[in-house]
Every structure is written in structure tokens, then in C-alpha cells.
């Protein structure tokens, strides 16, 4: 037992370190402290030699290089919390169909309608059926024709002579599209205001008077062939006059009661016939025959005379046909 104790040592047996071990640890700790102190002193000397202070450098980086005067902010009585801005999600959109149609101009609506009929030909019949139900007044037709006539006059090229009855070939080339547009529109309007489209023959006479007056006052050209479209339109108007006069001849009441008015129409037709160089001769003769019949209506045999007149004029315009629009 004694030998074992001497070999192992009392400190080891009971968990205590010997004095030699304690002294060695103290020496090591002291040596480490000295080494750390010497290292810190070396770093301090090195930094001082370079003129740099770690703490001061840190402060200089935090502070602005150019100090600016700070604005005094008045203290707030109440702290207001900042809210995130609310952005609206509503975006623009085009007008509804019915609202857009209300705001469209006549030209815009006409353009869209024509485009629809071009792309969908089946819609043309639908539009045509709707147009049949409409009754356009003579005043509207007159406004439309005056617009076309204004465009025709604006297309006349400048001329020093200002002679609109002897225009040149160059003027005809410039004016031809407007001439055709005006004449076609004129014939279309007249055809819409004669029987059986309308029952009032006075309206038919009124629009015939208006359109004939317009055609006779159109600017003409020095070369006779350039006036072909005018003469062709006057021939169509002559056929239309004859058609309306036939309906008047069948209307006994109008022939008797409106005799003075019919005579007034005869005087106008005579003037138009002179201006167009006799193209309206046939309808003028028909109208004059009605005036002769009207003079014999006062007799007791007025009924027979009227029937004879109606038989005489039925089919009197068989040789007249409304030509195609050029």
C-alpha cells in the first residue's frame, strides 16, 4: 500500500493537483498576459505612427463631411400615423354602343353603316326594308341637294371670265364626280316623292319644280358633249313629269278644283322648257291638254269628257323610260 501511494501521489488519489502543477499553470497564465500586453502595445504604437485612430475614424465616417445646419422641427401635439396611399383600380373604357351612336356625327354614322353593309351583304336588305317605312320630307331632300350643289360649285376651277355657261374641258374633268353625285341624288329624291310612294300629287309637283329649277341653273360647258349628263337628267325629269301628269289626269277632283294651280304649273314648265331647249316639250303638251279638258268640265257632260281624257292619256308615256343613273 505504501509503495502504491508513493508512486501515484496523494494529490492524484484524492483529486487535488500538486503544488508543482499549480505553479506551472500560474506561470503560463502570466506569460500569456504579458504576451497580450506586448501585442496591444505594438498595435497601438503602429496605429499612432500612421496617424490613425480607430475610434476617431469611426466617428468621422458616421458624421457628415460638410456639416449642414439642422432645421428646427416644431414639436407635434399629436403624432399622425402615415398610411399607405390607396391607388384606384378603375381604368378607362369605351362608350357603350347605344351611347356611342348618340354622340356620332352624321358622317361617322354613315361611314360605319356603309362598312357594315360591305362586310355583311345580308344587312343591306334589312336596311332597305327599314328605309321603305320612312317618309322623308321635301325639306330634307332640298337640304341634301343644296349641300351637293354647293360642293359642285366649289369644285369649279378659278377662271378670270367667271362665265359659268362656257366652262372649259379642264373644268369638266374637275367637276365630273360632283356632277354625277348631284344628278344621281336628285333623281333618287324625286323617285321617292312620286306615286305610289306618295299619294299627294302636289308634293310630287313641288319636288319636280324644285329639281328642274336646279338642273336648268347648273353651270354648263363650252363643249356640247360635256353637257351630256345634264341633258340626260332633263330627259329623266321629263319622264317623271309625264308620270305625275298621268296621275293628275286620273284624279277628277284635282283636275276640277285645282285648275288655277295647274295653269301656274304650266307657266313654270314653259319657262323650264325654254331654258333646256325643248327637252320638256312632251310633259308641257300634256299639261296644256289638261287645261283644255278642265275648261269643258263645267258642261253637263263633264263626266264623259273626263273619261275620254283619262282614256286618251293612259299610256301616253310608253315611249319614256327613266334612264339609268350615269
UniProtKB/Swiss-Prot annotation:
| Statement: the UniProt record of this protein carries the keyword Transport | yes
Q: Which Pfam families match?
A: Cut8
**GO terms of molecular function:** proteasome binding
Query: Which function does this protein serve?
Result: Involved in ubiquitin-mediated protein degradation. Regulatory factor in the ubiquitin/proteasome pathway that controls the turnover of proteasome substrates. Targets proteasomes to the nucleus and facilitates the degradation of nuclear proteins.
Indicate what this protein is called per its UniProt record.
Tethering factor for nuclear proteasome STS1
Question: Which family is annotated?
Answer: Belongs to the cut8/STS1 family.
Keywords annotated in UniProt: Cytoplasm, Nucleus, Protein transport, Transport
The Gene Ontology CC terms held by the record are: cytoplasm; nuclear membrane
Which BP terms does GO give this entry?
Answer: nuclear protein quality control by the ubiquitin-proteasome system; proteasome localization; protein transport
Q: Outline the subunit composition.
A: Binds the proteasome.
Annotated region (Disordered), positions in chain: 51-75, 300-326
Report the subcellular localization: Cytoplasm; Nucleus
